[in-house]
C-alpha cells in the first residue's frame, strides 16, 4: 500500500466529503486498514468515532482489535474486512461474520471458482477487486519493501520494490560461474482488468466491485468508474453487451502496464501476469518512428492512434515524456491527426535516442 503518500483527509475535509457524498446519494467508506501499534489505537478509535458522528456508511479495517472495539461501541456501524486481512477461503468469511463484520473484501489472489464457492455458502456481503494494480505477493502480506527498502508496505509506505529492474542469474554449483537468464522488471505485474468477468461475478452473488485507484488521477477514477458502471447496469438490466473497443481503448489510455491482465480470476500464468519491459503507464501504442532528425528536433511516423496538439508521448526504452506542441502532415501544421496519417512531430528537443 502507498496510502502514506496520498493526500489524505483531515477532520474537516472528511466531514465535507461525507456530506458531499450523502447529498448525491453516494456511500462513503473510511479505510483504517492497517495493523495498529498499541500507541496508535486511541487515535484510530478517535478518528472512527468522528467518522461515525459525521455519518460514515462503513469503516474498512484490518486490525481485529480495532474491529472488536468498534463493533462493541458502535454496533450499528457496518464493518468491512479489508483485503489486507487476506480472506481467501470460506472459513475466514464465516469467522468474520461471527466477529460482527458485514462485508469481506476478498484477497485478489482468488480464482473465479473460489469466489463463486464463497458467495454460494455465505450470506455475508462479498466485495472483490476488478480493476487496478496487483501485488506480486499476497496483498498486505508482502515484506519485500521492508526488507530491501526499510519501508513497510503494510504501514502504507511501499517502496514498490516489485516495480524495480532485476537480473535473473543461474549459478553453476560445480564451476561457480553465473549466467544471466533474464533482465528487466521481472516482478512487475500488469494491472487487473476484470471487465469480461462482471456478469459471472454478479451471477455468483458478489455484492460490490472494487477499483484500485491509490495515487491515480481524477481522470483515471472517472474513466474506469464510468466504464464499469455502464457494463454493470447493462447486466443488471438483463442486457449484457460485448465490450466495446472504444471502452477498452479508454481504459488502456488512462493507465496500463503493457496491456491488462485477468490476474488470478482465471489463474493466469506468471508469464502473462508480469510485464517485464516497463513498470509504469504505457498509454496507447502510437506507432514506430520511421525518421528522426536530432538537429531539427523532428520525428516522423505513421500513426496507429489519433494524435493532437497537447497530447503527451513517450518512447520505448526512454523515461522522459514529451508534450506535442507542433504537428505536421505533408509539411503543413495541423491541430490533430487521425489514425493511419503519416505525421511529423516538431520541437522534439531533449535526450532522445533513436533505437534501430
Model-found features: residue ranges?
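Long C-terminal interaction/binding lobes of large macromolecular proteins
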Residues: 9
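Basic, amphipathic alpha-helical recognition segments used for DNA target recognition
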Residues: 69
